Amino acid sequence: MPSDRQKKIRNFSIIAHIDHGKSTLADRLIEYTGLISQREMQSQMLDNMDLERERGITIKLQTIRLVYKAKDGEEYYLNLIDTPGHVDFTYEVSRSLAACEGAVLIVDAAQGIEAQTLANVYLALEQDLEIIPVINKIDLPSARPDEIKTEIEDIIGLDASEAPLISAKEGLNIEDVLESIVKNVPSPKGDINAPLKALIFDSYYDSYKGVIAYMRVMEGQVKKGMKVKMMATNKEFEVVEVGAFSPGAIPLDSLSAGDVGYLAASIKDVRHCRVGDTITDALNPTESPLPGYRKVNPMVYCGIYPAEGEKYEDIRDALEKLQVNDAALVFEPESSAALGFGFRCGFLGLLHMEIIQERLEREFDLDLITTAPSVIYKITKTNGEELMIQNPANMPTPQEIRIMEEPIVKTTIMVPNTYVGAVMELCQDRRGEMKDMQYIDDTRVNLYYEMPLNEVIYDFFDALKSKTKGYGSLDYELLGYRASDLVKLDILINGEQIDALSFIVHESKAYSRGKGMCEKLKDEIPRHQFPIPLQAAVGNKVISRETIKALRKDVLAKCYGGDISRKKKLLEKQKEGKKRMRQVGNVEVPQKAFMSVLKLDN
């Protein structure tokens, strides 16, 4: 039987497409319940990384406890768990949804439902959550709330007749949302007297208290001084502090079934506190862990190397600290002839990669070089051995390879029908294979494509946005591997192969990518005293070449008029010298050249 206290708890999260006003609504809810005075209020209250505020996106999960006095005169505890909306962070969304009983679905009154909205709704439905649709941005002149209501009913199948119409920016009708949460979200179930069972849905590292786990207590209760055990790693810890966020950390005596809060237990290593793990009482453990958590596998890899004057150890320390907060980041040491010692890092997607790079540069003040992102390829050698390759440098020679397969993703692209042609062209250009096309309503279309992940991770998202004036949206999931004509493209500078610039590319694109890289390098590498050939090669065959001309002294300056043979002699002598120089000279490739080539779009 749920206790009286449990009846007053509502755990919910907010799901929305990027930019539909999720963090703004969270700010308004905080303001409305009087948790923070107007003076202390800042926008995107829950996005506490500078980077999140700057890009206006939510990366890490946040949680906050609101106290709301409802119209029925009762006080309710509303635990808001904020979720990221970007496609790279789908796993984080699924974790926060598992900690809730309900979800507020925000739909933009002008733009309507987008691909990411749908993807998150399906995640919420899988967890059996009560979904409350809310229509935001009704203050916009282009808002069309009634059409959006029917759209929600037609596409998702939710009853939206009573959906609150709000403007989070203007603070309109915020109370309706709170009332709707109190009324529609079920209160948590769970026996307070059962053995402790709590779900970790996020963690971060505090330099004083060690790893702090954000958790939702499902059954039992957790108190200070209790011994707890992590079920995935079987490690035991003594609880030093438990509490809730409101918005800063507020220590409490205990958290019981239904509560959302945090736990500190002097955990030194984040790997002992896996997101999605179950915490239980070490002396009286629960029988089975909570279902549904998997280890996240990186989809995109790239090399991170120290730039001039940076130390390898500093990067390792920084990566370890980031890994504390980011269970999805993996890294291992590697070395490259061109760049020295560095790390091979795995990420969930390109946005995740950019964010980690920016955090390394900002929070740890490091200067980095990153190599071109690549995915994991599956290679079957002629002797039957199977390899998984994510670094082009480890690729066997073409003679040894029997089949080479690349990861394929199933993409769902939602676009206004005026842009269908442009998007289909883009997908074909990226080697996409059309599987299906569905009209959602008279204005929008869902396109289903199977595409190589390699083509999606570069800049597909940006290209899609520019082709659709920002209205296209994308969601993708991994399907599996498929054989493909892939080749390894090497870049040779002055006849020497530069391993950091090698990458794996589809045969049809090898020439254009190789030519593009050579041209870019030609602009970036300073001229030397001898001519430098830049070549792009596949195997032993050079497919493109540029030459950086030599700097030369004007050896004829001292000859006035005079005999041609004298001039010839001087020019020949200079030519000989340059030739000798070219054999012994080595080319300095500035780091700027690496950076600009690796940022090479399309």
Swiss-Prot record:
EC number, UniProt record: 3.6.5.n1
Keyword Lipid metabolism attributed: no
Localization per Swiss-Prot or TrEMBL: Cell membrane
Record-listed GTP binding positions: 19-24, 136-139
Alphabetically ordered keywords of this record: Cell membrane, GTP-binding, Hydrolase, Membrane, Nucleotide-binding, Protein biosynthesis
Biological process according to GO: positive regulation of translation
Residues of the signal peptide: none
Main location: membrane
An annotated GO cellular component: plasma membrane
Molecular function terms from GO: GTP binding; GTPase activity; ribosome binding; translation elongation factor activity
Keyword Cytoplasm: no
Reactions the enzyme catalyzes: GTP + H2O = GDP + phosphate + H(+)
InterPro entries per record: EF-4, EFG_III/V, EFG_V-like, EFTu-like_2, G_TR_CS, LepA_C_sf, LepA_CTD, LepA_IV
Membrane-topology annotation of the record: Peripheral membrane protein
A Pfam family hit: EFG_C
CDD domains xref list: EF4_II (cd03699), EF4_III (cd16260), LepA (cd01890), lepA_C (cd03709)
tr-type G domain boundaries: 7-189
Protein family: Belongs to the TRAFAC class translation factor GTPase superfamily. Classic translation factor GTPase family. LepA subfamily.
PANTHER family: TRANSLATION FACTOR GUF1 HOMOLOG, CHLOROPLASTIC (PTHR43512:SF4), TRANSLATION FACTOR GUF1-RELATED (PTHR43512)
Job of this protein: Required for accurate and efficient protein synthesis under certain stress conditions. May act as a fidelity factor of the translation reaction, by catalyzing a one-codon backward translocation of tRNAs on improperly translocated ribosomes. Back-translocation proceeds from a post-translocation (POST) complex to a pre-translocation (PRE) complex, thus giving elongation factor G a second chance to translocate the tRNAs correctly. Binds to ribosomes in a GTP-dependent manner.
Stated name of the protein: Elongation factor 4
Organism: Alkaliphilus oremlandii (strain OhILAs) (Clostridium oremlandii (strain OhILAs))
Gene (name only): lepA
